[in-house]
């Protein structure tokens, strides 16, 4: 039975093979592929025709809409305001034609411009329609000028945005890359390089005002100074920069200057040698200024710094430190009494001579008695060295019955009532530099130092004189926008904050 089944299967396979052969014979024969080298030249390189891609049909509801930002100004953008601008009489006077304003007639053609105007928190799109006028003689053809509050020279941003970028970077210690991220969250894509250009352009415009403020500060009778450092991103130039502030408390003016290397000669430039006093916190470069030839200012050292040194001794020499702190507190009580009673300079000086002088002598007596017994390199020894100078010089002068030079600098405030007993006003103004170190860590390059110093000078003067810096900057940019060259001195004096 198995043999019979096998023979039947073999027969079926043969029948199927014959049927397949018949089907294959009926099919057309396949063309053999010939290599390109055997083909004729006309058939070797045939231009390949690309198939045209059919555009996808999109529903009208799903069409991509333009972002509501001023950086893609097209027909889909929402216009917030429309202004119609006309030719002014000043334009007619500046033209070469001798025709009067009444001789000009309007032309039907109008130019349209779109501007991005910064309003606190967002941009507003303003569309301007510029009217055109032509004189009867046909020599001049005038077009309405864009107002200064909409656009600045060589910039597509308005003065308000320039002022906002400057204040965020200088006063709010907000680096440019953070400003870029903040604007991106609001829906505006502005690069860091663009923000940097706006900052430098703002500093270039207000540079004459900053120089005028520094010139006035250097002539002050009493000058408060202090310095700080900030790192530089470019290590090839230098690693650190010194930024110094000079304050005229009487006129509420301050001037910032920066140096790559801070020397006594550099600092001497900052103050007029005909002035009387300069206040500082016993920095070595300031003390060297007293030995420069032709320098006439007397140095007054800050008692608040001496008080901090004494305060650090409370854990180690409690009774000694508390005794000195109470005496320094009495000095401040004398100043507070004179301020509350609005005493004149003469009466204020008499009060210092009668009370403060005796207190300073008692402080000197306690410090000189403990100097010899203090252990070298201890905190007590370093505090007395800060007040009286080195021990060798002090011992030589004490034998002669003279007082050290450093202590005489601490007592300079007894000579004139205009001198404050501390240097806190300049330290408060320099506090922003510490904020910069926490937020941005460094400044980009050495060339950017005058940019920051100029902006610091004008903005901190606004704070001293209780002037809104944002509104002041906008007003200055609008007024100086029309000047191509440097403005005259009269206008610069009027634009100083508070004038």
Task: Describe each region flagged by the PLM.
Residues 1-153, 224-225, 355-356, 360:
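Short, flexible loop/hinge motifs at secondary-structure junctions
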Residues 1-7, 11-15, 69-74, 132-134, ...:
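Catalytic center-proximal scaffold of phosphoryl-transfer enzymes
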């Amino acid at each position: 039975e198995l043999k019979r089944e096998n023979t039947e299967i073999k027969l079926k396979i043969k029948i199927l093979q014959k049927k397949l052969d018949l089907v294959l014979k009926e099919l057309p024969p396949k063309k053999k592929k010939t290599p390109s080298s055997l083909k004729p030249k006309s058939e070797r390189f045939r231009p390949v025709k690309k198939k045209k891609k059919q555009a996808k049909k999109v529903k009208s509801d799903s069409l991509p809409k333009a972002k509501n930002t001023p950086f893609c100004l097209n027909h889909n953008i929402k216009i917030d305001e429309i202004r119609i601008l006309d030719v002014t009489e000043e334009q007619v006077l500046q033209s070469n034609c001798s025709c009067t304003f009444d001789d000009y007639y309007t032309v039907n053609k109008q130019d349209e411009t779109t501007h991005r105007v910064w309003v606190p928190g967002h941009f507003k799109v303003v569309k301007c329609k510029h009217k055109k006028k032509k004189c009867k003689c046909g020599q001049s053809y005038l077009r309405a000028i864009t107002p200064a509050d909409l656009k600045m020279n060589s910039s597509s941003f308005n003065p308000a945005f320039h002022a906002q970028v400057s204040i965020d970077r200088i006063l709010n210690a907000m680096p440019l890359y953070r400003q870029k991220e903040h604007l991106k969250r609001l829906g505006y894509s502005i690069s860091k390089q663009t923000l940097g250009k706006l900052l430098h352009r703002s500093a270039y415009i207000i540079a004459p005002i900053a120089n005028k403020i520094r010139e006035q500060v250097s002539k002050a009778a009493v000058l408060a100074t202090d310095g700080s450092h900030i790192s530089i991103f470019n290590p090839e130039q230098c690693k650190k920069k010194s930024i110094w502030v000079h304050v005229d408390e009487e006129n509420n003016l301050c001037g910032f200057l920066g140096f790559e290397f801070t020397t006594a000669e550099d600092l001497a430039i900052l103050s007029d040698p005909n002035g009387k006093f300069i206040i500082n916190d016993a920095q070595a470069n300031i003390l060297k200024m007293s030995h420069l030839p032709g320098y006439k200012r007397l140095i007054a050292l800050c008692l608040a710094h001496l008080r901090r040194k004494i305060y650090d001794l409370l854990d180690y020499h409690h009774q000694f430190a508390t005794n000195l702190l109470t005496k320094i507190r009495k000095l401040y009580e004398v100043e507070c009494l004179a301020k509350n009673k609005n005493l004149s300079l003469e009466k204020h000086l008499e009060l210092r001579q009668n009370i403060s002088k005796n207190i300073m002598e008692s402080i000197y007596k306690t410090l000189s008695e403990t100097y010899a017994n203090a252990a070298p390199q201890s905190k007590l020894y370093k505090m007395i060295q800060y007040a009286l100078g080195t021990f060798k010089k002090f011992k030589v002068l004490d034998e002669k019955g003279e007082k050290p030079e450093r202590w005489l600098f601490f007592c300079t405030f007894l000579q004139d009532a205009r001198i404050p007993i501390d240097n806190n006003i300049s330290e408060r103004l320099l506090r922003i530099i510490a904020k910069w170190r926490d937020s941005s860590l460094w400044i980009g390059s050495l060339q950017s130092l005058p940019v920051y110093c100029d902006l610091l000078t004008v903005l901190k003067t606004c704070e001293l004189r209780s002037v809104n810096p944002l509104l002041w900057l906008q007003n200055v940019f609008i007024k100086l926008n029309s000047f191509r060259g440097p403005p005259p001195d009269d206008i610069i004096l009027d634009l100083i904050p508070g004038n």
